[in-house]
Amino acid sequence: METTPLNSQKELSAYKDGEDCQENGVLQKGVPAPGDKAESGQISNGYSAVPNPGAGDDTQHSIPAATTALVAEVHPAERETWAKKVDFLLSVIGYAVDLGNVWRFPYICYQNGGGAFLLPYTIMAIFGGIPLFYMELALGQYHRNGCISIWTKICPIFKGIGCAICLIAFYIASYYNTIIAWALYYLISSFTEQLPWTSCENSWNTGNCTNYFSEDNITWTLHSTSPAEEFYTRHVLQIHRSKGLQDLGGLSWQLVLCIMFIFTVIYFSIWKGVKTSGKVVWVTATFPYIILLILLVRGATLPGAWRGVLFYLKPNWQKLLETGVWVDAAAQIFFSLGPGFGVLLAFASYNKFHNNCYQDALVTSAVNCMTSFVSGFVIFTVLGYMAEMRKEDVSEVAKDAGPSLLFITYAEAIANMPASTFFAIVFFLMLITLGLDSTFAGLEGVITAVLDEFPHVWAKRREWFVLGVVITCFFGSLVTLTFGGAYVVKLLEEFATGPAVLTVALIEAVAVFWFYGINQFCSDVKEMLGFSPGWFWKICWVAISPLFLLFIICSFLMSPPQLRLFQYDYPRWSIILGYCIGTSSFICIPTYITYRLIVTPGTLKERIIKGITPETPTAIPCGDIRLNAV
């Protein structure tokens, strides 16, 4: 094909969007007919002039160093995009708003000073969580790649970050969907006239079962258990049939069937990509808000609701002097927004190039934080009602944390409300949809990463690859479906994600803002949005956000969690196992760095320079003209 050099800005400007153009100021005169497979031009990403693969020798002229090259860039092979902008927003909101917003935030809030906790939570969100959230959306949208291959365009030596993210996603899928399976089991059990966790007359109940809400006079002892607690522990989990991590017992076939159904729904929701998942989230992302509103109104009308709200929001300003409160605030906002999991990179990569990801970051972050806050009212109005009925203090009712808060305390409260069957059904449906959204997102992050890394292998076999991922996650979940599976869920939740994801996110931020460069990153953002991030964002990205992550990591390492579930204290060897699981994902990063330095030719200095220099250009829409210093 004949090519003509473009020697001036005027000549470049003469060509409009839609005309074929190649980098290094070369325009293709011929326009391929529809159906023809044309070569895609690439760009230099601001570092070096990269010849266009497949072009003739006459197009491969080097440009002297320290000069400015006019570069006309084209889009690479057509990438799937969201059908509508709202599909993307709902997917991100559905991912960020998960089960943790319902059970973790309310518990952490009242435990750390009530209304006073909102101050450190807001500060950590503004200076730590939201900047990292914005960073990942911008990176994904600009480079249009998943969490593995994107590093060849940023800082190749850190490609191990993508591998670590994928391994963490597998760990999460191995236990998170089990919690959804518990909710599904509760949902199925709710289709009865009398909810099965309201009485002590079932086959799984023990002599210690005592019903608070019984009309008969009761005597509550230290060994007494509620019907809801025994339904959860002895019927759903059957944890009494396990001796601990050393003897998990057999599989619960009921939970195996539940999780098979869940993975089937997941598969048919994501097998075709964002075109299908973007439609599913219209239900799974909006339904929880309808139910939250219903439960909020119902809870507010219950006797004693005001006691729960007062307990939830009454500020204890002295708590702010404790370091643990700030650590909990930082950890909560980080895990709530979810940077570092590769999901935001994947979702944003399907956006249009000039989509306003800055606005998206602010909107979705605000929605996520507000959802957490409102969920606290939903939970504590009901806890206040329970305290009123039991004639106890709210603090006595709100002892449970984590899944127990939902499956024991809240389930018991619902069971003793008027129209309990209806509220139980909608509540557990809400939990299922909250969980499914996050699972869609987590697996899509892995799928996008692998498909982008190996396009020639999996590009036309997405359905089969997704099936393989889902089956792998199903088999990985089996250990959590045993009678002692709840012990494994707790172990994975504490160690497989916490410190590992924080460390990965810290290295990601350092790689982007210190190696790729804050100026280059801001230039990329300006190219997409038309404006450059201000000094506030730059300071947060370069210094505050990395320190924010380092603060949480150091706090975790200095005060490792003392794990206890029900009456079971985790043995020391299980804590060591937990650290090994967490390290297994993080170790991907130094392993790849070592491998990269070994296989790259040249001196050590040359190897390092090559490792931190982008090797794969980023293509942007045709017609966009960049001034690249090369």
Curated annotation (Swiss-Prot):
Subcellular location per UniProt equals: Cell membrane; Endomembrane system; Endosome membrane; Synapse
Q: Which residues cross the membrane?
A: 88-112, 116-135, 161-186, 253-271, 278-297, 325-347, 361-380, 422-443, 464-483, 495-516, 539-558, 575-595
Residues bearing glycans: 208, 217
Task: Please give a single GO biological process term from the UniProt record.
Answer: brain morphogenesis
| Cytoplasmic side, ranges | 1-87, 136-160, 272-277, 348-360, 444-463, 517-538, 596-630
Record-listed Phosphotyrosine modification sites: 47, 142
Entry keyword Metal-binding: yes
Q: Which PROSITE patterns match?
A: NA_NEUROTRAN_SYMP_1 (PS00610), NA_NEUROTRAN_SYMP_2 (PS00754), NA_NEUROTRAN_SYMP_3 (PS50267)
Q: Which family does it belong to?
A: Belongs to the sodium:neurotransmitter symporter (SNF) (TC 2.A.22) family. SLC6A4 subfamily.
The protein's name in its UniProt record: Sodium-dependent serotonin transporter
Q: Which species is this record about?
A: Bos taurus (Bovine)
Lineage per the UniProt record: Eukaryota, Metazoa, Chordata, Craniata, Vertebrata
